[in-house]
Amino acid sequence: MDLQDITISGSGSIGKGNYKEVKISGSCKTLGDITAETVKISGSLKAEGAVKAEEVKVSGSASFSKDMEAGELKVSGSVKVEDKIKCGQGVLNGSVKCKIIEGESVTVNGIITGCEEINADEIHLGIGRTYINQLHADHIEIRLPAHGLFWRSFEVPEFDEIDCTDIKAEGMKCKKLCCKDCDLGEFCEIEYLEYSGIANIQCKNKIKNINKI
């Protein structure tokens, strides 16, 4: 049986079910769990069930009362998820509010709030002042946003705990960092650093405790 395409350009709702392509340029509400090959949101979506798709693109606004799962996720608009985002490849350039992000590769260049934890193979962050409780990954890169001659005054992202294989960070505040290899720029402040491999540290006077194991 062929899957149905759904397009909402005015105001409407989508019932529980399996779909091929879902396009929303108006105002839409889902009335249950939906699965789809593609979900594209340039309007407004209120999902009252879980959403699972091979590809999700949000350039408008979307709120999800349950988990949202996508093979490929691209956000240039606004997304609010009550619990968890699961993705293969996630590029978050808009505004995202959620508790947990899980993925293979997660890139955040926008605004992220309410996030307790990011778990991924790779994490790439290009953000300013943000608080995230925990990062867990093989590879982590943290870049400060470009801001001309004044980028040094940017408030850096803050983390309670980072656990990874290797990390390269231009600037951050972290209570506990455990890794194998690290490359830490001069705008990093760390309370406790534990590493077992190679360390390039430009901010030694801003690290309270260093433990090479």
Located regions from the model:
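Extended beta-solenoid/beta-helix repeat architectures
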Residues: 1-213
